[in-house]
């Protein structure tokens, strides 16, 4: 696998017990897994800024976690962040999200699986990610399904994950490179380094050249 554009901080060189505990949590729970945090660990304040925001806004918060998870992976599929897009939230899975739900993301409006509430949140993610007009029709739709605190949290989260994913995709980071040995939060077919390589080599891989050609043809 390629080397990242910015080096990982080796956990063995860290003396901060709290940072080590957070990296171990990433190893055991995922989303995020350790690699992205091992990059942020170059600046401890950034490491903790992300960890705390992710805990408070994504893992917890006032809006449904599964809806935020769909928005997260919608962003991954849109900006082609493979590192983020090949992870799945374990908590969202416990709340009923299944792999088939992710497959409809880029065509969410015509999905027969996703609810109207989920589609409204994804329309919000679409507008933010692609700089689309946020007209009265969109906002009426959003207010029909969400409270104002939920809209603040979902919008803030989409902006947070979009910025991080646009950055991370430039770094060439990959799973199973830092504190490996677990499959925590990996998407099906990406649980080990060997499985990841096989899945990324498949013709139907979501971020592969064939998928890119399909997306461009659909535009």
Regions found by a protein language model. Give the residues of each.
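Acidic/histidine-rich alpha-helical segments that form the ligand environment
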Residues: 117-157
